[in-house]
A protein has these predicted regions:
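ATP-hydrolysis module of ASCE/P-loop NTPase motor domains
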Residues: 55, 78-83, 102-184, 292-300, ...
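C-terminal accessory regions
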Residues: 434, 541-545, 551, 594-624
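Conserved SF2 helicase motif VI
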Residues: 576-581, 621-624
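Conserved helicase/translocase P-loop NTPase motor core
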Residues: 86, 90-93, 184-233, 245-249, ...
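Conserved motor-region signature of P-loop NTPase helicases/translocases
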Residues: 1-66, 70, 116, 124, ...
Length: 624
Protein backbone atom coordinates (compact mmCIF):
# COMPACT_ATOMS: atom_id res chain seq x y z
CA UNK A 1 0.00 0.00 0.00
CA UNK A 2 1.46 3.38 -0.97
CA UNK A 3 2.37 5.75 1.83
CA UNK A 4 -0.21 8.48 2.42
CA UNK A 5 0.70 11.63 4.32
CA UNK A 6 -1.87 12.22 7.05
CA UNK A 7 -2.58 15.33 9.04
CA UNK A 8 -1.79 15.20 12.78
CA UNK A 9 -5.52 14.87 13.55
CA UNK A 10 -5.97 12.05 11.04
CA UNK A 11 -2.97 10.27 12.52
CA UNK A 12 -4.52 10.52 15.99
CA UNK A 13 -7.66 8.81 14.72
CA UNK A 14 -5.66 6.01 13.10
CA UNK A 15 -3.46 5.49 16.16
CA UNK A 16 -6.22 5.54 18.77
CA UNK A 17 -6.81 2.03 20.14
CA UNK A 18 -8.21 0.53 23.31
CA UNK A 19 -10.87 3.14 24.05
CA UNK A 20 -14.10 4.35 22.52
CA UNK A 21 -13.57 7.08 19.97
CA UNK A 22 -15.82 9.68 18.35
CA UNK A 23 -14.68 11.67 15.34
CA UNK A 24 -16.36 14.83 14.09
CA UNK A 25 -15.26 14.97 10.45
CA UNK A 26 -15.95 18.20 8.62
CA UNK A 27 -16.61 18.44 4.90
CA UNK A 28 -13.59 17.59 2.73
CA UNK A 29 -11.48 16.48 5.70
CA UNK A 30 -10.19 13.21 4.23
CA UNK A 31 -12.54 11.09 6.31
CA UNK A 32 -12.71 8.05 4.02
CA UNK A 33 -8.93 7.89 3.66
CA UNK A 34 -8.60 8.01 7.44
CA UNK A 35 -11.09 5.19 7.96
CA UNK A 36 -9.44 2.97 5.36
CA UNK A 37 -6.04 3.49 6.98
CA UNK A 38 -7.45 2.74 10.42
CA UNK A 39 -8.71 -0.62 9.14
CA UNK A 40 -5.33 -1.20 7.51
CA UNK A 41 -3.55 -0.46 10.79
CA UNK A 42 -5.84 -2.90 12.61
CA UNK A 43 -4.87 -5.72 10.23
CA UNK A 44 -1.25 -4.65 10.29
CA UNK A 45 -1.22 -5.07 14.07
CA UNK A 46 -3.06 -8.40 13.91
CA UNK A 47 -3.95 -10.01 10.54
CA UNK A 48 -6.57 -12.16 12.27
CA UNK A 49 -8.54 -9.13 13.48
CA UNK A 50 -12.02 -8.50 12.12
CA UNK A 51 -13.82 -5.22 11.58
CA UNK A 52 -17.38 -4.16 10.84
CA UNK A 53 -17.68 -0.92 8.85
CA UNK A 54 -21.22 0.44 8.70
CA UNK A 55 -22.54 3.40 6.74
CA UNK A 56 -26.02 4.79 6.21
CA UNK A 57 -26.36 5.12 2.44
CA UNK A 58 -25.75 2.62 -0.35
CA UNK A 59 -23.40 5.05 -2.08
CA UNK A 60 -21.13 5.65 0.91
CA UNK A 61 -21.09 1.96 1.86
CA UNK A 62 -20.22 0.99 -1.72
CA UNK A 63 -17.44 3.61 -1.90
CA UNK A 64 -16.00 2.46 1.42
CA UNK A 65 -16.11 -1.20 0.39
CA UNK A 66 -14.42 -0.47 -2.94
CA UNK A 67 -11.59 1.48 -1.31
CA UNK A 68 -11.12 -1.07 1.46
CA UNK A 69 -10.92 -3.94 -1.02
CA UNK A 70 -8.44 -2.03 -3.17
CA UNK A 71 -6.19 -0.77 -0.38
CA UNK A 72 -6.29 -3.81 1.90
CA UNK A 73 -6.24 -6.49 -0.83
CA UNK A 74 -9.18 -8.19 0.89
CA UNK A 75 -10.17 -10.05 -2.25
CA UNK A 76 -6.94 -12.01 -2.13
CA UNK A 77 -7.38 -13.38 1.36
CA UNK A 78 -10.03 -16.00 1.08
CA UNK A 79 -13.17 -14.21 0.04
CA UNK A 80 -14.68 -10.93 -1.00
CA UNK A 81 -14.15 -9.39 2.43
CA UNK A 82 -12.44 -12.20 4.35
CA UNK A 83 -14.95 -12.22 7.19
CA UNK A 84 -15.15 -8.45 7.57
CA UNK A 85 -18.52 -6.71 7.35
CA UNK A 86 -18.80 -3.60 5.18
CA UNK A 87 -22.44 -2.66 4.62
CA UNK A 88 -25.30 -0.25 5.17
CA UNK A 89 -27.19 -0.21 8.46
CA UNK A 90 -30.01 -2.23 6.88
CA UNK A 91 -27.45 -4.66 5.47
CA UNK A 92 -26.12 -5.05 9.01
CA UNK A 93 -29.62 -5.71 10.33
CA UNK A 94 -30.24 -8.30 7.61
CA UNK A 95 -26.95 -10.06 8.42
CA UNK A 96 -27.84 -10.17 12.12
CA UNK A 97 -31.25 -11.67 11.38
CA UNK A 98 -29.86 -14.22 8.93
CA UNK A 99 -27.33 -15.51 11.47
CA UNK A 100 -29.84 -15.53 14.34
CA UNK A 101 -33.18 -16.21 12.69
CA UNK A 102 -34.44 -18.50 15.46
CA UNK A 103 -33.89 -15.86 18.13
CA UNK A 104 -35.77 -13.37 15.97
CA UNK A 105 -38.66 -15.82 15.65
CA UNK A 106 -38.10 -16.22 11.92
CA UNK A 107 -37.13 -19.16 9.72
CA UNK A 108 -34.19 -17.42 8.03
CA UNK A 109 -35.62 -17.74 4.52
CA UNK A 110 -37.42 -14.40 4.47
CA UNK A 111 -36.74 -12.02 1.61
CA UNK A 112 -36.65 -8.23 1.86
CA UNK A 113 -39.33 -6.19 0.12
CA UNK A 114 -38.46 -3.30 -2.13
CA UNK A 115 -40.10 0.00 -1.21
CA UNK A 116 -42.66 -0.37 -4.01
CA UNK A 117 -43.51 -3.94 -2.99
CA UNK A 118 -43.98 -2.89 0.63
CA UNK A 119 -46.15 0.00 -0.52
CA UNK A 120 -48.41 -2.37 -2.45
CA UNK A 121 -48.89 -4.70 0.54
CA UNK A 122 -49.66 -1.73 2.75
CA UNK A 123 -52.27 -0.45 0.29
CA UNK A 124 -53.91 -3.86 0.24
CA UNK A 125 -54.10 -3.82 4.04
CA UNK A 126 -55.66 -0.34 3.99
CA UNK A 127 -58.16 -1.42 1.32
CA UNK A 128 -59.76 -3.74 3.87
CA UNK A 129 -61.25 -0.62 5.42
CA UNK A 130 -63.31 0.04 2.29
CA UNK A 131 -64.08 -3.38 0.86
CA UNK A 132 -64.50 -5.82 3.75
CA UNK A 133 -66.89 -6.32 6.62
CA UNK A 134 -65.23 -4.67 9.60
CA UNK A 135 -65.56 -5.45 13.30
CA UNK A 136 -68.09 -3.11 14.84
CA UNK A 137 -65.52 -1.15 16.88
CA UNK A 138 -63.29 -0.65 13.82
CA UNK A 139 -66.28 0.44 11.73
CA UNK A 140 -67.26 2.99 14.37
CA UNK A 141 -63.76 4.42 14.58
CA UNK A 142 -63.53 4.57 10.78
CA UNK A 143 -66.80 6.47 10.48
CA UNK A 144 -65.79 8.80 13.28
CA UNK A 145 -62.51 9.68 11.54
CA UNK A 146 -64.16 10.01 8.11
CA UNK A 147 -66.51 12.59 9.61
CA UNK A 148 -63.39 14.54 10.53
CA UNK A 149 -61.03 13.74 7.63
CA UNK A 150 -61.27 13.21 3.89
CA UNK A 151 -60.35 9.73 2.72
CA UNK A 152 -57.04 10.95 1.31
CA UNK A 153 -56.22 12.77 4.56
CA UNK A 154 -57.01 9.66 6.59
CA UNK A 155 -54.76 7.57 4.35
CA UNK A 156 -51.99 10.07 5.00
CA UNK A 157 -52.50 9.79 8.75
CA UNK A 158 -52.34 5.99 8.63
CA UNK A 159 -49.18 6.13 6.52
CA UNK A 160 -47.56 8.52 9.00
CA UNK A 161 -48.39 6.21 11.91
CA UNK A 162 -46.89 3.27 10.00
CA UNK A 163 -43.67 5.14 9.26
CA UNK A 164 -43.27 6.02 12.95
CA UNK A 165 -44.28 2.66 14.42
CA UNK A 166 -40.70 1.51 14.97
CA UNK A 167 -40.03 4.60 17.06
CA UNK A 168 -42.91 4.17 19.51
CA UNK A 169 -45.72 6.26 18.07
CA UNK A 170 -48.35 3.65 19.02
CA UNK A 171 -47.34 3.89 22.67
CA UNK A 172 -47.49 7.66 22.44
CA UNK A 173 -50.99 7.52 20.92
CA UNK A 174 -52.04 5.16 23.71
CA UNK A 175 -51.03 7.78 26.25
CA UNK A 176 -52.72 10.60 24.34
CA UNK A 177 -56.05 11.91 25.53
CA UNK A 178 -58.96 12.61 23.27
CA UNK A 179 -61.33 10.58 21.15
CA UNK A 180 -59.58 11.50 17.90
CA UNK A 181 -56.27 9.98 18.97
CA UNK A 182 -57.95 6.87 20.36
CA UNK A 183 -59.84 6.33 17.10
CA UNK A 184 -56.66 6.77 15.05
CA UNK A 185 -54.83 4.34 17.31
CA UNK A 186 -57.52 1.66 16.94
CA UNK A 187 -57.71 2.05 13.17
CA UNK A 188 -53.92 2.01 12.82
CA UNK A 189 -53.62 -1.14 14.90
CA UNK A 190 -56.22 -2.89 12.74
CA UNK A 191 -54.47 -2.03 9.46
CA UNK A 192 -51.00 -2.75 10.84
CA UNK A 193 -52.11 -6.14 12.09
CA UNK A 194 -53.32 -7.17 8.63
CA UNK A 195 -50.19 -5.72 7.03
CA UNK A 196 -48.01 -7.80 9.36
CA UNK A 197 -50.07 -10.94 8.67
CA UNK A 198 -49.76 -10.36 4.92
CA UNK A 199 -45.97 -10.17 5.19
CA UNK A 200 -45.80 -13.30 7.33
CA UNK A 201 -47.86 -15.32 4.84
CA UNK A 202 -45.50 -14.30 2.05
CA UNK A 203 -42.32 -14.74 4.08
CA UNK A 204 -41.13 -11.17 3.53
CA UNK A 205 -39.76 -8.30 5.60
CA UNK A 206 -39.72 -4.56 5.04
CA UNK A 207 -36.97 -2.16 6.13
CA UNK A 208 -38.72 -1.40 9.42
CA UNK A 209 -38.81 -5.14 10.15
CA UNK A 210 -35.06 -5.38 9.63
CA UNK A 211 -34.48 -2.84 12.38
CA UNK A 212 -37.17 -4.28 14.65
CA UNK A 213 -36.01 -7.92 14.45
CA UNK A 214 -32.33 -6.99 14.64
CA UNK A 215 -33.11 -5.08 17.82
CA UNK A 216 -34.81 -8.18 19.25
CA UNK A 217 -31.83 -10.38 18.38
CA UNK A 218 -29.33 -7.98 19.89
CA UNK A 219 -31.14 -8.09 23.24
CA UNK A 220 -29.76 -11.62 23.63
CA UNK A 221 -26.66 -11.48 25.87
CA UNK A 222 -25.00 -14.45 24.15
CA UNK A 223 -25.39 -12.84 20.75
CA UNK A 224 -24.00 -9.57 22.08
CA UNK A 225 -20.93 -11.28 23.52
CA UNK A 226 -20.34 -13.24 20.31
CA UNK A 227 -20.30 -10.14 18.12
CA UNK A 228 -18.33 -8.12 20.67
CA UNK A 229 -15.67 -10.82 20.69
CA UNK A 230 -15.69 -11.30 16.90
CA UNK A 231 -15.29 -7.66 15.85
CA UNK A 232 -12.14 -5.94 17.07
CA UNK A 233 -13.26 -2.71 15.44
CA UNK A 234 -16.80 -1.45 14.90
CA UNK A 235 -16.49 1.53 12.59
CA UNK A 236 -19.64 3.57 12.01
CA UNK A 237 -19.59 6.25 9.31
CA UNK A 238 -22.24 8.98 8.78
CA UNK A 239 -23.45 8.46 12.33
CA UNK A 240 -25.21 11.84 12.24
CA UNK A 241 -27.84 10.18 10.03
CA UNK A 242 -28.80 7.45 12.49
CA UNK A 243 -32.05 7.07 14.38
CA UNK A 244 -32.31 5.83 17.99
CA UNK A 245 -33.22 2.24 17.05
CA UNK A 246 -30.24 1.92 14.71
CA UNK A 247 -27.96 3.42 17.35
CA UNK A 248 -29.19 0.91 19.93
CA UNK A 249 -28.46 -2.00 17.58
CA UNK A 250 -24.93 -0.77 16.91
CA UNK A 251 -24.26 -0.17 20.61
CA UNK A 252 -24.83 -3.87 21.32
CA UNK A 253 -21.71 -4.65 19.22
CA UNK A 254 -19.60 -2.55 21.55
CA UNK A 255 -17.50 -4.15 24.27
CA UNK A 256 -18.10 -3.10 27.89
CA UNK A 257 -14.95 -0.97 27.87
CA UNK A 258 -15.96 0.54 24.48
CA UNK A 259 -12.50 -0.36 23.16
CA UNK A 260 -13.74 -1.56 19.75
CA UNK A 261 -15.92 1.42 18.80
CA UNK A 262 -15.15 4.32 16.48
CA UNK A 263 -18.05 6.50 15.33
CA UNK A 264 -17.59 9.15 12.66
CA UNK A 265 -19.97 11.87 11.63
CA UNK A 266 -20.65 15.55 11.30
CA UNK A 267 -23.75 16.96 13.00
CA UNK A 268 -23.64 19.87 10.55
CA UNK A 269 -24.42 17.40 7.73
CA UNK A 270 -27.47 15.73 9.29
CA UNK A 271 -30.25 16.25 6.70
CA UNK A 272 -32.47 13.16 7.04
CA UNK A 273 -34.91 14.24 9.73
CA UNK A 274 -37.78 12.95 7.57
CA UNK A 275 -36.39 9.44 8.22
CA UNK A 276 -36.34 10.17 11.98
CA UNK A 277 -32.58 10.66 11.92
CA UNK A 278 -31.69 12.75 14.96
CA UNK A 279 -28.51 14.78 15.24
CA UNK A 280 -28.81 14.54 19.04
CA UNK A 281 -28.21 10.77 18.87
CA UNK A 282 -24.70 11.41 17.58
CA UNK A 283 -24.02 14.14 20.10
CA UNK A 284 -25.22 12.07 23.07
CA UNK A 285 -23.11 9.08 22.04
CA UNK A 286 -20.05 11.29 21.62
CA UNK A 287 -20.53 12.47 25.19
CA UNK A 288 -20.28 8.84 26.39
CA UNK A 289 -16.98 8.09 24.66
CA UNK A 290 -13.67 9.02 26.29
CA UNK A 291 -11.69 9.87 23.15
CA UNK A 292 -12.88 12.73 20.94
CA UNK A 293 -11.19 13.83 17.72
CA UNK A 294 -11.91 16.65 15.30
CA UNK A 295 -11.04 16.54 11.60
CA UNK A 296 -11.48 20.10 10.37
CA UNK A 297 -8.66 20.49 7.88
CA UNK A 298 -10.31 20.86 4.48
CA UNK A 299 -8.36 19.44 1.54
CA UNK A 300 -11.13 19.85 -1.04
CA UNK A 301 -11.98 23.53 -1.49
CA UNK A 302 -10.00 26.69 -2.07
CA UNK A 303 -9.24 28.89 0.96
CA UNK A 304 -11.60 31.64 -0.18
CA UNK A 305 -14.52 29.21 -0.25
CA UNK A 306 -13.67 27.92 3.23
CA UNK A 307 -13.31 31.45 4.60
CA UNK A 308 -16.69 32.40 3.13
CA UNK A 309 -18.32 29.24 4.51
CA UNK A 310 -16.94 29.91 7.98
CA UNK A 311 -17.98 33.55 7.87
CA UNK A 312 -21.57 32.72 6.92
CA UNK A 313 -22.11 29.50 8.86
CA UNK A 314 -20.64 30.64 12.17
CA UNK A 315 -23.37 33.28 12.35
CA UNK A 316 -26.09 31.06 10.90
CA UNK A 317 -25.43 28.19 13.32
CA UNK A 318 -25.33 30.36 16.46
CA UNK A 319 -28.98 29.87 17.47
CA UNK A 320 -29.17 26.23 16.30
CA UNK A 321 -28.73 22.96 18.19
CA UNK A 322 -25.39 22.25 16.46
CA UNK A 323 -22.11 23.93 17.39
CA UNK A 324 -20.21 25.15 14.35
CA UNK A 325 -16.58 24.02 14.14
CA UNK A 326 -14.71 26.25 11.66
CA UNK A 327 -12.95 24.52 8.78
CA UNK A 328 -9.25 25.16 8.16
CA UNK A 329 -8.29 25.39 4.46
CA UNK A 330 -5.27 23.36 3.36
CA UNK A 331 -5.34 23.86 -0.40
CA UNK A 332 -3.03 26.44 -1.88
CA UNK A 333 -4.81 29.69 -2.82
CA UNK A 334 -4.97 30.90 -6.41
CA UNK A 335 -4.22 34.61 -6.47
CA UNK A 336 -5.66 34.92 -9.97
CA UNK A 337 -9.05 33.52 -8.99
CA UNK A 338 -11.80 34.95 -6.82
CA UNK A 339 -13.34 31.74 -5.46
CA UNK A 340 -16.62 33.30 -4.28
CA UNK A 341 -18.72 35.66 -6.39
CA UNK A 342 -22.06 37.22 -5.59
CA UNK A 343 -24.26 37.77 -8.62
CA UNK A 344 -26.99 40.37 -8.18
CA UNK A 345 -29.27 39.40 -11.04
CA UNK A 346 -32.32 41.31 -12.18
CA UNK A 347 -33.81 38.20 -13.78
CA UNK A 348 -32.92 34.54 -14.44
CA UNK A 349 -31.97 35.33 -18.05
CA UNK A 350 -28.91 37.19 -16.80
CA UNK A 351 -27.62 33.96 -15.28
CA UNK A 352 -27.50 32.42 -18.76
CA UNK A 353 -25.52 35.40 -20.03
CA UNK A 354 -23.03 35.07 -17.16
CA UNK A 355 -22.55 31.32 -17.68
CA UNK A 356 -21.92 31.80 -21.39
CA UNK A 357 -19.32 34.40 -20.52
CA UNK A 358 -17.54 31.94 -18.24
CA UNK A 359 -17.42 29.41 -21.05
CA UNK A 360 -16.35 31.78 -23.81
CA UNK A 361 -14.00 34.16 -21.98
CA UNK A 362 -12.68 32.05 -19.10
CA UNK A 363 -12.68 28.64 -20.83
CA UNK A 364 -14.74 26.98 -18.09
CA UNK A 365 -16.25 23.73 -19.44
CA UNK A 366 -20.00 23.49 -18.92
CA UNK A 367 -19.66 20.02 -17.41
CA UNK A 368 -17.46 21.48 -14.66
CA UNK A 369 -20.37 23.62 -13.46
CA UNK A 370 -23.45 22.73 -11.45
CA UNK A 371 -26.53 24.79 -10.61
CA UNK A 372 -28.00 23.95 -7.22
CA UNK A 373 -31.67 24.58 -6.43
CA UNK A 374 -33.08 24.61 -2.93
CA UNK A 375 -36.23 22.95 -4.24
CA UNK A 376 -37.90 22.11 -7.55
CA UNK A 377 -41.22 23.87 -7.08
CA UNK A 378 -41.04 27.54 -7.95
CA UNK A 379 -37.59 27.34 -9.53
CA UNK A 380 -38.46 26.26 -13.05
CA UNK A 381 -37.81 29.86 -14.16
CA UNK A 382 -34.07 29.25 -13.87
CA UNK A 383 -34.19 26.21 -16.13
CA UNK A 384 -36.39 27.95 -18.67
CA UNK A 385 -33.98 30.87 -18.80
CA UNK A 386 -30.96 28.61 -19.24
CA UNK A 387 -32.67 26.65 -22.02
CA UNK A 388 -33.75 29.86 -23.73
CA UNK A 389 -30.13 31.02 -23.62
CA UNK A 390 -29.11 27.96 -25.61
CA UNK A 391 -27.24 26.34 -22.73
CA UNK A 392 -27.57 22.53 -22.80
CA UNK A 393 -28.46 21.31 -19.32
CA UNK A 394 -28.56 17.84 -17.83
CA UNK A 395 -31.11 17.10 -15.13
CA UNK A 396 -32.62 13.83 -14.10
CA UNK A 397 -32.82 11.20 -11.40
CA UNK A 398 -29.37 9.74 -12.03
CA UNK A 399 -28.35 6.47 -13.62
CA UNK A 400 -30.40 5.15 -16.54
CA UNK A 401 -33.10 7.79 -16.81
CA UNK A 402 -35.78 5.80 -18.58
CA UNK A 403 -35.37 2.85 -16.23
CA UNK A 404 -36.41 4.97 -13.26
CA UNK A 405 -39.96 3.79 -12.41
CA UNK A 406 -40.97 7.32 -11.41
CA UNK A 407 -40.02 8.63 -14.86
CA UNK A 408 -42.09 5.89 -16.47
CA UNK A 409 -45.06 6.63 -14.18
CA UNK A 410 -44.95 10.35 -14.98
CA UNK A 411 -44.64 9.61 -18.71
CA UNK A 412 -47.68 7.34 -18.41
CA UNK A 413 -49.53 10.27 -16.86
CA UNK A 414 -48.74 12.51 -19.85
CA UNK A 415 -49.76 9.79 -22.28
CA UNK A 416 -53.07 9.32 -20.45
CA UNK A 417 -53.73 13.05 -20.30
CA UNK A 418 -52.99 13.35 -24.00
CA UNK A 419 -55.48 10.61 -24.80
CA UNK A 420 -57.92 9.33 -22.17
CA UNK A 421 -58.32 6.08 -24.09
CA UNK A 422 -54.83 5.04 -22.94
CA UNK A 423 -56.41 3.51 -19.85
CA UNK A 424 -53.45 1.25 -19.03
CA UNK A 425 -51.18 4.29 -18.89
CA UNK A 426 -53.69 6.00 -16.65
CA UNK A 427 -53.87 3.00 -14.35
CA UNK A 428 -50.05 2.81 -14.19
CA UNK A 429 -49.97 6.44 -13.08
CA UNK A 430 -52.80 6.10 -10.55
CA UNK A 431 -51.33 3.04 -8.85
CA UNK A 432 -47.86 4.61 -8.59
CA UNK A 433 -46.72 4.63 -4.92
CA UNK A 434 -46.59 8.44 -4.81
CA UNK A 435 -50.20 8.67 -6.10
CA UNK A 436 -51.52 5.72 -4.17
CA UNK A 437 -54.87 4.83 -5.77
CA UNK A 438 -55.63 1.19 -5.00
CA UNK A 439 -56.34 -1.44 -7.65
CA UNK A 440 -59.83 -1.96 -6.25
CA UNK A 441 -60.63 1.73 -6.57
CA UNK A 442 -59.27 1.80 -10.12
CA UNK A 443 -61.38 -1.24 -11.03
CA UNK A 444 -64.45 0.42 -9.55
CA UNK A 445 -63.80 3.64 -11.48
CA UNK A 446 -63.30 1.75 -14.74
CA UNK A 447 -66.75 0.16 -14.34
CA UNK A 448 -68.29 3.62 -14.03
CA UNK A 449 -66.04 5.41 -16.53
CA UNK A 450 -63.77 3.31 -18.78
CA UNK A 451 -61.47 6.31 -19.30
CA UNK A 452 -60.90 6.90 -15.54
CA UNK A 453 -60.00 10.57 -15.83
CA UNK A 454 -63.28 12.24 -14.88
CA UNK A 455 -63.73 10.20 -11.70
CA UNK A 456 -60.15 10.79 -10.64
CA UNK A 457 -60.52 14.55 -11.15
CA UNK A 458 -63.72 14.49 -9.08
CA UNK A 459 -61.93 12.81 -6.18
CA UNK A 460 -60.43 14.67 -3.22
CA UNK A 461 -56.92 13.50 -4.03
CA UNK A 462 -54.60 16.56 -3.86
CA UNK A 463 -53.11 15.80 -7.29
CA UNK A 464 -56.60 15.58 -8.78
CA UNK A 465 -57.50 18.94 -7.25
CA UNK A 466 -54.34 20.47 -8.69
CA UNK A 467 -54.98 19.03 -12.16
CA UNK A 468 -58.66 19.99 -12.31
CA UNK A 469 -57.75 23.52 -13.46
CA UNK A 470 -56.52 22.05 -16.76
CA UNK A 471 -59.35 19.62 -17.49
CA UNK A 472 -61.01 21.87 -20.08
CA UNK A 473 -57.81 23.31 -21.57
CA UNK A 474 -56.92 21.53 -24.84
CA UNK A 475 -53.76 23.63 -25.26
CA UNK A 476 -52.27 23.16 -21.81
CA UNK A 477 -48.50 23.45 -21.66
CA UNK A 478 -47.07 19.97 -20.84
CA UNK A 479 -44.32 21.44 -18.68
CA UNK A 480 -46.85 23.38 -16.61
CA UNK A 481 -48.95 20.24 -16.30
CA UNK A 482 -45.97 18.31 -14.96
CA UNK A 483 -45.16 20.92 -12.34
CA UNK A 484 -48.74 20.79 -11.10
CA UNK A 485 -48.06 17.25 -9.86
CA UNK A 486 -45.80 18.66 -7.12
CA UNK A 487 -48.63 19.43 -4.72
CA UNK A 488 -46.76 18.99 -1.44
CA UNK A 489 -43.33 18.40 0.07
CA UNK A 490 -43.83 14.65 0.40
CA UNK A 491 -44.53 14.15 -3.31
CA UNK A 492 -41.70 16.50 -4.28
CA UNK A 493 -39.33 14.48 -2.09
CA UNK A 494 -40.48 11.30 -3.85
CA UNK A 495 -40.53 12.38 -7.51
CA UNK A 496 -39.11 15.90 -7.66
CA UNK A 497 -35.77 15.13 -9.25
CA UNK A 498 -37.19 12.59 -11.71
CA UNK A 499 -39.88 15.08 -12.69
CA UNK A 500 -37.27 17.80 -13.13
CA UNK A 501 -35.42 15.66 -15.66
CA UNK A 502 -38.61 14.89 -17.56
CA UNK A 503 -39.73 18.52 -17.40
CA UNK A 504 -36.47 19.58 -19.03
CA UNK A 505 -36.98 17.11 -21.89
CA UNK A 506 -40.55 18.34 -22.35
CA UNK A 507 -39.36 21.94 -22.52
CA UNK A 508 -36.71 21.07 -25.11
CA UNK A 509 -39.28 19.34 -27.30
CA UNK A 510 -41.79 22.18 -26.90
CA UNK A 511 -39.24 24.79 -27.98
CA UNK A 512 -38.83 22.83 -31.22
CA UNK A 513 -42.47 23.58 -32.01
CA UNK A 514 -43.94 20.20 -31.05
CA UNK A 515 -47.49 20.28 -29.70
CA UNK A 516 -48.63 18.34 -26.63
CA UNK A 517 -49.44 15.14 -28.52
CA UNK A 518 -46.14 15.19 -30.41
CA UNK A 519 -44.19 15.75 -27.20
CA UNK A 520 -45.93 12.80 -25.58
CA UNK A 521 -45.29 10.65 -28.65
CA UNK A 522 -41.55 11.41 -28.48
CA UNK A 523 -41.39 10.67 -24.76
CA UNK A 524 -43.35 7.46 -25.13
CA UNK A 525 -41.07 6.28 -27.92
CA UNK A 526 -38.02 7.04 -25.78
CA UNK A 527 -39.51 5.16 -22.85
CA UNK A 528 -40.50 2.14 -24.92
CA UNK A 529 -37.06 1.96 -26.51
CA UNK A 530 -35.44 2.47 -23.07
CA UNK A 531 -32.93 4.82 -24.60
CA UNK A 532 -29.88 4.62 -22.42
CA UNK A 533 -29.74 8.30 -21.56
CA UNK A 534 -27.18 8.57 -18.81
CA UNK A 535 -27.80 11.55 -16.61
CA UNK A 536 -25.48 13.20 -14.20
CA UNK A 537 -24.40 12.29 -11.68
CA UNK A 538 -22.68 9.95 -12.50
CA UNK A 539 -21.17 10.22 -15.09
CA UNK A 540 -21.13 13.87 -16.02
CA UNK A 541 -22.47 14.77 -19.43
CA UNK A 542 -19.71 16.44 -21.41
CA UNK A 543 -20.80 19.76 -22.82
CA UNK A 544 -23.83 20.06 -20.53
CA UNK A 545 -24.54 22.10 -17.43
CA UNK A 546 -25.65 19.96 -14.49
CA UNK A 547 -28.69 20.94 -12.43
CA UNK A 548 -29.28 19.36 -9.03
CA UNK A 549 -31.24 20.00 -5.89
CA UNK A 550 -29.16 20.73 -2.80
CA UNK A 551 -30.40 17.52 -1.21
CA UNK A 552 -29.49 15.50 -4.29
CA UNK A 553 -26.00 16.95 -4.43
CA UNK A 554 -24.80 15.50 -1.13
CA UNK A 555 -21.53 13.62 -1.57
CA UNK A 556 -20.77 15.08 -5.01
CA UNK A 557 -18.02 17.47 -6.10
CA UNK A 558 -17.85 20.05 -8.90
CA UNK A 559 -15.15 22.64 -9.67
CA UNK A 560 -17.75 25.41 -10.05
CA UNK A 561 -20.96 25.57 -8.00
CA UNK A 562 -23.75 28.08 -8.65
CA UNK A 563 -26.26 28.54 -5.83
CA UNK A 564 -29.46 30.23 -6.97
CA UNK A 565 -32.52 31.67 -5.28
CA UNK A 566 -30.90 32.04 -1.86
CA UNK A 567 -32.47 35.42 -1.15
CA UNK A 568 -35.89 33.97 -0.36
CA UNK A 569 -36.86 32.86 3.12
CA UNK A 570 -36.60 29.20 4.04
CA UNK A 571 -40.05 27.67 4.14
CA UNK A 572 -40.84 25.30 6.94
CA UNK A 573 -42.28 21.98 5.91
CA UNK A 574 -46.07 21.82 5.79
CA UNK A 575 -47.40 21.32 9.31
CA UNK A 576 -48.47 17.68 9.63
CA UNK A 577 -51.82 16.61 11.00
CA UNK A 578 -50.07 14.23 13.37
CA UNK A 579 -47.17 15.90 15.14
CA UNK A 580 -44.51 13.62 16.56
CA UNK A 581 -41.42 13.86 18.70
CA UNK A 582 -39.87 10.94 20.56
CA UNK A 583 -39.52 13.06 23.70
CA UNK A 584 -42.64 15.22 23.50
CA UNK A 585 -44.98 12.46 22.25
CA UNK A 586 -47.75 13.02 19.70
CA UNK A 587 -50.44 15.56 18.99
CA UNK A 588 -53.29 15.16 16.51
CA UNK A 589 -54.41 18.53 15.18
CA UNK A 590 -58.01 19.47 15.90
CA UNK A 591 -60.81 20.05 13.40
CA UNK A 592 -63.81 22.35 13.69
CA UNK A 593 -67.40 21.47 12.84
CA UNK A 594 -66.73 22.25 9.15
CA UNK A 595 -63.77 19.90 8.98
CA UNK A 596 -61.22 22.72 8.85
CA UNK A 597 -58.17 22.83 11.08
CA UNK A 598 -58.75 24.90 14.20
CA UNK A 599 -56.90 28.17 13.67
CA UNK A 600 -56.52 29.21 17.30
CA UNK A 601 -55.22 26.13 19.06
CA UNK A 602 -52.53 27.09 21.55
CA UNK A 603 -51.32 23.51 21.84
CA UNK A 604 -50.92 23.12 18.08
CA UNK A 605 -49.27 26.55 17.89
CA UNK A 606 -46.54 25.27 20.20
CA UNK A 607 -46.07 22.19 18.01
CA UNK A 608 -45.98 24.32 14.85
CA UNK A 609 -43.32 26.54 16.39
CA UNK A 610 -41.29 23.48 17.32
CA UNK A 611 -41.60 22.04 13.78
CA UNK A 612 -40.58 25.37 12.27
CA UNK A 613 -37.50 25.53 14.48
CA UNK A 614 -36.45 21.99 13.56
CA UNK A 615 -37.03 22.63 9.85
CA UNK A 616 -34.97 25.80 9.99
CA UNK A 617 -32.11 24.00 11.74
CA UNK A 618 -32.08 21.33 9.04
CA UNK A 619 -32.16 23.99 6.30
CA UNK A 620 -28.99 25.47 7.82
CA UNK A 621 -27.29 22.08 7.76
CA UNK A 622 -28.39 21.52 4.17
CA UNK A 623 -26.90 24.86 3.15
CA UNK A 624 -23.59 23.96 4.84
Amino acid sequence: MSKIQLSPMQQKVVNCWGKGQSVVAGAGSGKTTTLVLKCFELLNKNPDSRFAAVSFTEKSASDLKEKLCAKLDLNGKGGALSGHWVMTIHGLCAAIIKENAQIAGLDGEESVLSESEAKLLWEQAVDRLWFEQLPQSVEQNLQYLLDRESRVSLLGLLQRVKSLTTFGVLDALTESEGKDSKALLALSQYVLRHYENSKKRRGVLDFDDLERYAKVVMQDKKVQKRYQKHFDLVLVDEFQDTNPVQAEIIWKFVRPDQSNLCVVGDPKQSIYRFRDADVNVFQKLCDQLPEKQLLNWNFRSRPGIIDYTNQVCEKVFEPSEVEYQPLIPKREPDENLDPVLRLDLNNPEELGVWIKKQVQENSVPLHDMVVLLRRVRGNEKWLKALSASGIPIAVGSGGLFWEDPRVREITCFLRWWSNSQHVLSGASFLRAPWVGISDDTIDQWIKEDPQLKSLFLQSDHPIAQSLSQFKDDPYVDPGKLLLSLLVNDEIESEIGFALLGLWHRVEELSTKGLDFHSVVRELTLAMEESRRERDVPPPRNLGQLTVLTMHGSKGLEFPHVILVDLAGKTRAANAPLLFWDRNKGTYLAKRDENGDRVKKDDHEAQWRSYEKEKSLDEAKRLFY
